[in-house]
């Protein structure tokens, strides 16, 4: 499960660990408006808390990177025009593959170059101005320490 770091109610609920759904306690200040709910759906919580293998929260720049990569994919992959909430899953997968601090999670999820991962993209181009701000103008850039310019799915 992937949520914005400034709206991660499911993640917060898992962290608290009492089996109950919990609201996100702050402002829902994220470009991922479609995921900025703040309160877990009780039915979804029952299913996800039992079935999801991992819960992640991501800053806005992870979703923005996902949008840019969907819009300019690797050779052979389709171009997808995605909104922020839909693109965060791709951005999160790339982050997990790229950064050493996610080695343990990568092992836990058994992610390697032979993995087949289903990404759920829950948002199309619902806000053309915002998509242009992020994709054309470079809005929400990845901070320098986290930038990677190689294919994260290639082994070195």
Model regions: which residues?
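Glycine-rich phosphate/pyrophosphate-binding loop at beta-loop-alpha junctions
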Residues: 1-50, 100, 104-154
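Active-site-adjacent helical/loop segments in soluble small-molecule enzymes
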Residues: 40-109
